[in-house]
């Protein structure tokens, strides 16, 4: 049995609440597997500090902790509102003008994006996370639109806008994003999360940029727009284009409706497992812990449901970035994960065995089936690229996976995958008993109480050859 036996992983957002080396270390010790750096806020100098702290904490704990760069994307916000307060009621008309820099108290509001270039008459526009709903009634000028308000509310400075029916025409990577991507390429982030994507083409564009910069970061596509979930086929195309998916439920609920979120979440988790892609469930999972030391019962059920559905990871946002109880939130999430995984089993799913990863998937299926039939304690996987480990993970085995690799980058990028614990070491021809013994000595594998042996299924192949996985062994040590 592995000491790292938390199958569903925890992704935590770094922010002011944990902006010290000591707090980052506490996050990692509490059970965080990946740290999210939100590039909507903060300076590059702050990012460099955080990266150094995360790597130091991971080294101290003796395990891989991944780092995710979350791009802001075309997040559209209002400008500064006079007195930070403007009341509206049904029937009111507002003019949102990109050319306006200062609000004078009238219905002419500054906005940080030229909506006139993208929006059409009749399209909805939601203000302040959907709290105020309106519809475009006129394109007033080359920089301004007029909207009619549908409900009462208060408009405040720099609140976000959602445009659920507006086509951005592939223009989802902003100038700020480009600068951040270039910065990230020099910092070797493990993952880059892409915001507000609308199609698989958006993912491919980011892929081309990363390749041109020499970055090997994996792409996490954030599913949060109405257009991204228009059809099952569109969702599947995005899943196939990306390396992973983040179910970003906040903006998705605003754009598509609250009732849509649970079904889309379930579909995306299934699609990711089918295609061997990472799936992260995010947004307000333990939201009440921003202000309270314990979660609500509904939040506990929310986290447990994501675990039961087979998500690779669950994410904490404001809970760790700005909350009063960041470390407690991680501990609570870990406790929920452990209890749920020990009292439930993720339903099996058929992986795609016709695509380019069919060999990996077939070997993975055989290894997991064998491990469960003989009640193995652990699956040990030697992997050069990480592909075999990901395929085994997608099968959602009810036991830990120790992924042995000589590639530090691969070890780090596997940190978020379901049930995976990375063990970095050079490959050798002499695998099997010696490898399992080494894992026991290093503390990665422990015997069960009352037993003196470990039963392991070992998946391996030709050393340092990508695509060479072809051998399954059973070893009792």
Where is each model-derived feature located?
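Non-catalytic helical/linker scaffolds that mediate oligomerization, partner binding
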Residues: 1-477
């Amino acid at each position: 049995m592995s000491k790292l036996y938390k199958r569903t992983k925890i992704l935590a957002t770094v922010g002011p609440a944990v902006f010290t080396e000591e707090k980052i270390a506490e996050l990692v010790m509490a059970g965080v597997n990946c740290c999210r750096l939100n590039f909507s806020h903060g300076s590059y100098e702050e990012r460099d500090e955080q990266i150094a702290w995360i790597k130091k904490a991971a080294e101290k704990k003796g395990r891989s902790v991944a780092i995710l760069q979350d791009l802001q994307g075309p997040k559209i916000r209002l400008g500064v509102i006079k007195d930070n307060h403007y009341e509206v009621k049904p029937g009111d008309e507002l003019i949102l003008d990109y050319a306006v820099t200062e609000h004078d108290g009238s219905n002419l509001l500054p906005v940080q994006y030229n909506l006139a270039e993208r929006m059409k008459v009749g399209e909805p526009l939601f203000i302040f996370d959907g709290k105020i709903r309106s519809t475009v009634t006129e394109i007033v000028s080359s920089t301004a639109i007029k909207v009619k308000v549908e409900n009462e509310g208060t408009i405040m400075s720099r609140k976000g806008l959602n445009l659920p029916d507006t086509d951005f025409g592939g223009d989802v990577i902003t100038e700020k994003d480009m600068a951040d991507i270039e910065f990230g390429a020099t910092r070797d982030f493990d993952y880059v999360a892409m915001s507000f994507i609308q199609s698989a083409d958006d993912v491919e564009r980011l892929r081309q940029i990363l390749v041109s910069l020499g970055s090997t970061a994996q792409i996490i596509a954030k599913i949060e727009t109405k257009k991204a979930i228009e059809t099952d086929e569109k969702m599947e195309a995005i899943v196939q284009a990306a390396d992973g998916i983040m179910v970003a439920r906040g903006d998705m609920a605003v754009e598509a409706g609250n009732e849509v979120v649970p079904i889309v979440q379930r579909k995306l988790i299934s699609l990711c497992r089918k295609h061997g892609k990472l799936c992260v469930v995010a947004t307000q999972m333990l939201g009440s812990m921003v202000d309270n030391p314990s979660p609500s019962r509904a939040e506990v059920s929310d986290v447990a449901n994501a675990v039961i559905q087979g998500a690779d990871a669950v994410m904490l946002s404001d809970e760790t970035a700005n909350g009063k109880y960041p470390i407690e939130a991680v501990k609570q999430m870990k406790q929920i994960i452990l209890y749920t995984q020990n009292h439930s089993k993720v339903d099996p799913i058929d992986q795609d065995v016709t695509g380019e990863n069919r060999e990996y998937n077939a070997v993975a299926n055989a290894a997991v089936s064998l491990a469960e039939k003989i009640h193995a304690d652990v699956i040990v996987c030697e992997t050069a690229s990480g592909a075999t480990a990901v395929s085994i993970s997608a099968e959602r085995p009810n036991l830990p996976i120790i992924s042995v690799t000589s590639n530090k980058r691969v070890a780090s990028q596997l940190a978020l995958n379901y049930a995976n614990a990375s063990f970095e070491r050079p490959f050798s021809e002499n695998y099997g008993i010696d490898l399992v013994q080494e894992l026991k000595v290093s503390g990665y594998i422990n015997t069960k109480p009352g037993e003196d042996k470990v039963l392991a299924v070992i998946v391996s192949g030709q050393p340092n050859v990508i695509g060479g996985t072809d051998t399954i062994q059973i070893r009792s040590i």
